[in-house]
């Protein structure tokens, strides 16, 4: 049935990570979006305001970070973004640590 939707516009995707395996959802999704943007000639990021009461586009609201937006649009490289994510994750982990219920370490970009 993989030809069932041939020729139709894709409006989303689902990921099914392997249970028990460490998985970095942000990194994976950024790479998927970048791959699609680089390899699908008809792919565009919609222009204009995404929702009423906010002056940002959909991609700006979803990613919320200029460097991540630059990456998915092709004007930044993965190594730069990966280092940026590491720094931002460390800040978040320090803030979140006091609220954690378990000793398990949070998974980080490596």
Language-model segments: which ranges?
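Conserved functional hotspot residues or short segments at active or partner-binding sites
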Residues: 1-83
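C-terminal regions of mature proteins
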Residues: 69-110
